[in-house]
Amino acid sequence: MNRRFLAGCAAISAAAVWTLAPAAQAQKKADWLADGGDPQRTAWQRNETILTKDTVKDMKLLWKIKLDNQPRQMHSLFPPLIAGNVTTAVGPKEIAIVAGVSDNIYAIDVDKGTLLWTKHFDSTYQEPPQTGGRGGSTLCPGGLTATPVLDQTSPGKYVAYVVSWDGRLRKLDVATGEDIEPPDLFVPPNGKPYALNLVNGVIYTATAQGCGGNPNNFYAYDLATKKVGNWAPGSGGMWPRTGPSVGKDGTVYAGSGDGDYIPAQQIYGQAMIGVKQNPQTKALELKDWYAPSNAYWMRKRDLDFSASSPIFDYKGKEYLVSSSKECRIWLLDTSALGGEDHRTPAHRTPLFCNEEVNFTMGVWGSLATWQDAKGTRWILSPFWGPKHSRFEAPIEHGQVVYGATAAFKLVDDKLGKPTLLPAWISRDMYMADPPVVANGVVYAYGSGESTTQRWPEPGHAGGSAGRIQESTHAVVYALEAETGKELWSSGDQITSWNHFSGLSVANGRVYIGTFDGMLYCFGAASLPARASTMPQESR
């Protein structure tokens, strides 16, 4: 196994470690253990105390670090996961775990902006020869495609679960990068799993695009028995950016892509699907589903489900929200996703973008949700392209051309039914991607990527090559959560863009990775800045 460990300091004595332990416990830090922050994929950091809507205006670049990951197609780095209180041989550390598409994992000391260890996975999969050296296609890049998930197993002890390109589940010690146990096959090799989830000792993922000739399935890996369960929708794949979400009863949710919707034949394309692990057999079984009333119309126009679906409680009931490239939000009661006919949502919003019915526009990525101090439930959605001309919010921050973040409030209408009301629309963002929220501040960003999908033509390359040439740079924005007012932006500090990645936030820091392998850490003015731009050398 090709593994490099950067030792930099000698180990301290056991007595010194014991002495530091009480201090480490007293200074409890927040975690960000999964893509989207939690198993429900809310993208809400509940434990942020350093950055506030009053102090975020002074946020600065604390550091940036160049990682040696090689891009594949348009993929590069995935959103960092944050282990806030890791016990290491040299004392407690806050560590960021970053996955790279080329089967790489990096551990970074966030206080210093330096690399602690890195691991490149061995592989049982042999890649066939490719022209161009970046994998098969934008949809099927090959490599590691699922953001890992972390688990705190005891105070100071964290485990990282990772699925490598060959489909094997890896279990790593976050402090050292060492394998805790041998890898075990979870999903077929050379597929395209999305961000991992972990609930009650079970790892979940979903796959899409039929990459590597593999079926599009939900997958579950039971850690206690090492049994794998799967369930197939019989049609379109599931491609929620931040992975499937899990409800309080263990049901796993993801929307399926373009495909036939014929439930009588167990074919569930163009639908929101809930599956659940059988506790005896460990198999995944269909629990419920919802298909929009215009599912066939959406399928013909490639407007399929395209976003991870946050789950939350509202007045004693559990709901999820989701969206698609059509650009409206569905509110679904998880006790009966689509009612008796599987076609009736609890509520659906009007269209708020994609008036042109363009399959490259609409909602992509993930929604977010949070609750303010007054108990109001908020829903956030990124979108690509202009705002719909018939959609209005009470607060709007200028013309939207390339994309924005839209906010909705969940309230009861006159009949007592839950309803999503528009609250605000942010400033224009170049291809707005999934927001995260912490302590009254929404962190949103424009990815800067070119989303134009076309064949080669005179003067323009096609496919990934053309999109890479035309992409610009990402910009992160801090917005007041209740109004959408811009409080801060990264401006031109980020020099590259990203594709199908995201933000992470914890303990006064906001992280974003880019196509060129650079990881940026912006943070509170009270935190020390240790800018690092040179590639980190292994030793």
Segment roles from a protein language model:
Residues 1-12:
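Bacterial N-terminal signal peptides that target proteins for export
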